């Protein structure tokens, strides 16, 4: 709130927006961003008696940048941009927002980034990522480490599935409790849409997700095991029924609003119908990398361990199944910038090794 202006962070058509309302005239306007897949949000604005608004802009191709915007003149001034060592040129990359259609007719926004001219070479290696829980929306963001993957010919894509709030509260409600499977179906349908549009093909398609996003990965490989060349599940929540039945585990009782209370038969049966651990069977599972942290208090280490053990028991393919246990890490992975880079490097090495086959 400013003396003469009211500024709102909004979401419109799936994009984060900054709306400015002149309190004297009632007129409003939105900041315009010349990008196809971006994120914008308000920075720290301590002064009320000013016409200067500070905000941050980032996208799949542009690092986080802080601007001052004059709400009277409409002029933006760049104050600071994250420095990228090594001569990064965003013009060499391209980002785009596509709209896929889910099996029930709902729209699935998909944000993609890749090196320019890559699309001229036909279907490429593509890593599809999603989260899709708790109403958390993964907006398009810049990643320094991701450049390593893009420079090796990968396309990176974010499927904005239900369970997030990409289109507001309705998107969240349609991806939780007894609607949870919509998150998984959206992800699969987004993947098939990208194949249809020839961004990739089955032999080049990889998927990734962590925590509740790891649940998504565990579910989609049960539903469509042969759709993926490889899958990465980081600290995955995969034994849904057992965990939600044990209130002694941290967060369990608080999570009933998200997944349901399995002490109620309707919720128990529904959870059992998608819980990755309970649905493991003799299938041609893709190549897999599963990671966990020994000190993880949110998804205890034994949950991914027992899942991998059961997968190995039912494993029928010649594909690889790796488990990486971080003995000094928690739910967020290794602390420290360089140790975190090692985790990313491991995931990328797994993906790249599969492209050599």
Task: Annotate each PLM feature.
Residues 11, 58, 132, 210, ...:
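Flexible loop residues that form catalytic
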Residues 66, 100, 110, 128, ...:
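Conserved hydrophobic/aromatic pocket- or pore-lining residues that grip, position, or stack substrates
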Residues 118-168, 300-301:
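Short substrate-entry loop that stabilizes the transition state in hydrolases
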Residues 158-357:
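Active-site-proximal cap/loop segments of hydrolase catalytic domains
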């Amino acid at each position: 709130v400013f003396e003469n202006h009211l500024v709102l962070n909004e979401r419109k058509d799936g994009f984060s927006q900054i709306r400015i309302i002149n309190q004297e005239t009632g007129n409003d306007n939105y900041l315009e961003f010349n990008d196809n897949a971006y994120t914008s949000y308000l920075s720290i604005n301590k002064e009320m008696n000013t016409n200067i608004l500070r905000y941050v802009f980032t996208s799949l191709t542009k690092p986080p940048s802080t601007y001052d915007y004059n709400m009277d003149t409409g002029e933006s001034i760049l104050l600071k941009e994250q420095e990228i060592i090594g001569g990064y040129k965003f013009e060499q990359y391209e980002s785009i927002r596509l709209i896929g259609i889910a099996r029930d007719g709902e729209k699935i926004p998909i944000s993609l980034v890749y090196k320019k001219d890559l699309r001229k070479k036909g279907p490429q290696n593509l890593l599809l990522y999603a989260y899709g829980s708790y109403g958390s929306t993964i907006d398009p963001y810049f990643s320094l480490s991701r450049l390593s993957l893009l420079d090796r010919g990968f396309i990176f894509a974010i499927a904005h599935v239900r369970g997030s709030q990409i289109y507001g509260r309705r998107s969240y409600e349609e991806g939780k409790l007894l609607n949870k499977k919509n998150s998984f179906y959206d992800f699969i349908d987004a993947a098939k849409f990208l194949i249809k549009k020839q961004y990739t093909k089955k032999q080049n398609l990889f998927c990734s997700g962590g925590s509740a996003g790891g649940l998504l990965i565990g579910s989609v490989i049960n539903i469509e095991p042969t759709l993926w060349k490889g899958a990465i599940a980081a600290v995955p929540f995969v034994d849904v029924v057992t965990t939600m039945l044990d209130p002694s585990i941290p967060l369990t009782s608080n999570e009933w609003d998200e997944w349901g209370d399995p002490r109620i038969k309707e919720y128990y049966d529904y959870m059992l119908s998608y819980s990755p651990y309970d649905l493991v069977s003799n299938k041609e599972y893709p190549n897999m990398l599963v990671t966990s942290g020994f000190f993880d208090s949110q998804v205890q280490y034994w949950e991914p361990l027992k899942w991998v053990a059961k997968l190995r028991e039912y494993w029928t393919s010649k594909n690889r199944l790796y488990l990486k246990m971080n003995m000094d890490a928690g739910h967020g992975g290794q602390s420290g910038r360089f140790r975190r880079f090692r985790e990313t490097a491991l995931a990328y090495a797994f993906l790249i090794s599969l492209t050599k086959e």
